């Protein structure tokens, strides 16, 4: 199988359920930013211990972003891939991890370790994807809501990954 099709040589790309749009169109800009976010989450996952809870969570988040990108690359009448449950799971993970860390009282300087730094990079890329999605105003979709929760989760995961310095004595 060849990786290239030549179909995009004219500056267009195909949508999930048919149709073509310019590669500079809003949905493709959104998906480009989300693709970068997914790659950053993958980088963070590569720095985590294989099989650890954070590693498993990161791979699930990467898979959620596939679903989100399919949602964006679909005509409005076919948007139903991203489910409210995905945002609720993300929110429950924020709540769960928040119990294991002491929330910083000041601004956080990223870079305590490689994993937390990668998660902070992922967070900033996710926030850019969210800003791009807001500008596109995706009708009948949970894309912006999910990206908002995901950026909060990435921030929380980064604080958790910083280690015992941000965890209360009861969980050290």
Question: Can you say where each PLM-predicted feature lies in the sequence?
Answer:
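Phosphate/pyrophosphate-binding loop motifs in nucleotide- or prenyl diphosphate-using proteins
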Residues: 1-172
């Amino acid at each position: 199988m060849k990786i290239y099709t030549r179909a995009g040589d004219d500056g267009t790309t195909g949508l999930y359920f048919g149709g073509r749009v310019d590669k500079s169109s809003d949905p493709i800009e959104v998906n480009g930013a989300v693709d970068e976010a997914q790659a950053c989450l993958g980088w963070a996952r590569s720095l985590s211990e294989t099989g650890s809870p954070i590693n498993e969570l990161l791979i699930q988040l990467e898979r959620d972003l596939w679903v989100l990108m399919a949602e964006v690359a679909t005509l409005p009448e076919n948007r139903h891939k991203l489910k409210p449950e995905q945002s609720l799971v993300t929110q429950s993970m924020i709540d769960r991890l928040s119990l294991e860390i002491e929330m910083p009282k000041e601004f956080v300087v990223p870079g305590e370790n490689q994993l937390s730094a990668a998660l902070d990079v992922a967070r900033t890329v996710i926030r850019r994807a969210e800003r791009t999605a807001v500008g596109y105003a995706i009708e009948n979709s949970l894309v912006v809501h999910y990206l908002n929760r995901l950026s909060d989760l990435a921030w929380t995961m980064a604080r958790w990954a910083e280690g015992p310095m941000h965890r209360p004595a009861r969980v050290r």
